[in-house]
């Protein structure tokens, strides 16, 4: 028996009825999301603490407030985003109405991960609801406490004829993906991303894949080591390093490494104390499986900071590795933990070559007092996002699209980009039924004169002026 058939049929029928299309309905759903966050803030903080040992600060900054900001932005701009977008016209269409209409795709599937289980569920959900879709949300079963809140509490705040939360592990997700959806939004690792894309291809379903990768962090000799260390340590250890845009490794000269290591030690001690395990500000690894994987990476290179672990507490200390080789296991996969390898390069050119030999990352960071150095890294590399002289602060701007490139993903979202991602941009031209004598120039028998006139009339114009 198919456990999802009835739910999907209910949602698809609701979409076909046109229920989700009016701005008033979309507005009500977004306000429901907002109430969910306000009225269940403590419950959500407790769930995030149980799943990931997230501090109240991290939960507020990276899960609750950022989701609320997305909702507020959508509520303020919904009707503007929904408006038909007028486009420029050529001479042949000057008497016509030409525009782009933003239409919902229909039935959308959102597959969210465990590392930011609230933010990475609600972020795409805001865009999908604002665009007028019906939505199936499949949260990660690994962050089980947050999953429980999303499954049991969130639906009370939304129209359940148009929204559903489904549960399960990999086997259930596989069965879910056998169904035809009109759009699939997946956040996770590239291996599972390939499975999702393969399933989507069977139905020619469009996808957004928010994946990961090894995010390089180049540190130039011309910079203040302590400032760099503060920012790199903070972003590397935020959420215990379980962030898809965290700096994954540092590229710097041996001379800068000699200054950076003690600066990193100083920053880690100031942030988390002499015993980071007792700090309320340092999270824990999500599961035994991920803990064992990370502990295995501690044997790479040479540990100069940290290296401690506690299996019972799922604790990995903030760790810095040096003497790391490009072929070491820690350089073959996204780390997703509070471990920072340092790889030595002799020049900026060598660092850029190192980056470009690898898969395109989700984020790339460059630190230097020289704007020319930062701009050169930006110009000569490719990544989903880029930030000069800081960590993943570019994510805080809803005016910037968030997404990967190549193996780090495809498509993007945040702010209006979320609305556009979940909207079909329909090309529309409305023509008057008369004026047949003018339009008859297109018809056979063709003459050189008619061809010249027609080509001139169809020529693309840069001017957007219209007669109507």
UniProtKB/Swiss-Prot annotation:
GO terms for biological process: aldehyde metabolic process; ethanol catabolic process; lipid metabolic process. One of its GO terms (molecular function) is aldehyde dehydrogenase (NAD+) activity. GO terms for cellular component: cytoplasm; plasma membrane. The modification N-acetylmethionine is found at residue 1. SUPFAM superfamilies: ALDH-like (SSF53720). Oxidizes medium and long chain saturated and unsaturated fatty aldehydes generated in the plasma membrane into non-toxic fatty acids. May have a protective role against the cytotoxicity induced by lipid peroxidation. Short-chain fatty aldehydes are not good substrates. Can use both NADP(+) and NAD(+) as electron acceptor in vitro, however in vivo preference will depend on their tissue levels. Low activity towards acetaldehyde and 3,4-dihydroxyphenylacetaldehyde. Able to metabolize aromatic aldehydes such as benzaldehyde to their acid form. This is Aldehyde dehydrogenase family 3 member B1.
């Amino acid at each position: 028996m198919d456990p999802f058939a009835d739910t999907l049929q209910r949602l698809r029928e609701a979409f076909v009825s046109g229920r989700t299309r009016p701005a008033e309905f979309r507005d009500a759903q977004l306000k429901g999301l907002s109430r969910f966050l306000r009225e269940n803030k403590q419950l959500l903080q407790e769930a995030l603490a149980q799943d990931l040992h997230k501090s109240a600060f991290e939960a507020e900054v990276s899960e609750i407030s950022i989701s609320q900001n997305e909702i507020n932005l959508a509520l303020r701009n919904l009707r503007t985003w929904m408006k038909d977008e007028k486009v420029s016209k050529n001479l042949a269409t000057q008497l016509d109405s030409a525009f782009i209409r933003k239409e919902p795709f229909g039935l959308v599937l959102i597959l969210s991960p465990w590392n930011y289980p609230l933010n990475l569920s609600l972020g795409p959900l805001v865009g999908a609801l604002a665009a007028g879709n019906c939505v199936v949300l499949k949260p990660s079963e690994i962050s089980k406490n947050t999953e429980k809140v999303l499954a049991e509490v969130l639906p009370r705040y939304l129209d359940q004829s148009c929204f559903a939360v489904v549960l399960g592990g990999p086997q259930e997700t596989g069965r879910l993906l056998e169904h035809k959806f009109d759009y699939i939004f997946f956040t996770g690792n590239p291996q599972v991303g390939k499975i999702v894309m393969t399933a989507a291809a069977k139905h020619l379903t469009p996808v957004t894949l928010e994946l990961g990768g090894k995010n390089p962090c180049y540190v130039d000799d011309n910079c203040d080591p302590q400032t760099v260390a503060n920012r790199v340590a903070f972003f590397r250890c935020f959420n215990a390093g379980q962030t898809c845009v965290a700096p994954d490794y540092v590229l710097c000269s041996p001379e800068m490494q000699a200054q950076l290591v003690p600066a990193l030690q100083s920053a880690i001690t100031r942030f988390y104390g002499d015993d980071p395990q007792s700090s309320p500000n340092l999270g824990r690894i999500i599961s035994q499986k991920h803990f064992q994987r990370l502990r295995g990476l501690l044997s790479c290179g040479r540990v100069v900071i940290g290296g401690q672990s506690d299996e019972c507490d799922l604790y990995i200390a903030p760790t810095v590795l040096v003497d790391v080789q490009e072929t070491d296991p820690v350089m073959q996969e996204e780390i997703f933990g509070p471990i920072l390898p340092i790889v030595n390069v002799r020049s900026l050119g060598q660092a850029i070559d190192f980056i470009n030999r690898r898969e395109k990352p989700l984020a790339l960071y460059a630190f230097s007092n020289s704007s020319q150095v930062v701009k050169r890294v930006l110009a000569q590399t490719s990544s989903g996002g880029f930030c000069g002289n800081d960590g993943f602060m570019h994510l805080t701007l809803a005016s910037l699209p968030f997404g990967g490139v190549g193996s780090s993903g495809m498509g993007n979202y945040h702010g209006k980009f979320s609305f556009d991602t979940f909207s079909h941009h329909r090309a529309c031209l409305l023509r008057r039924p008369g004026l047949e004598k003018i339009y008859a120039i297109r018809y056979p028998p063709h003459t050189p004169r008619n061809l010249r006139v027609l080509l001139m009339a169809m020529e693309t114009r840069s001017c957007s002026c219209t007669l109507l």
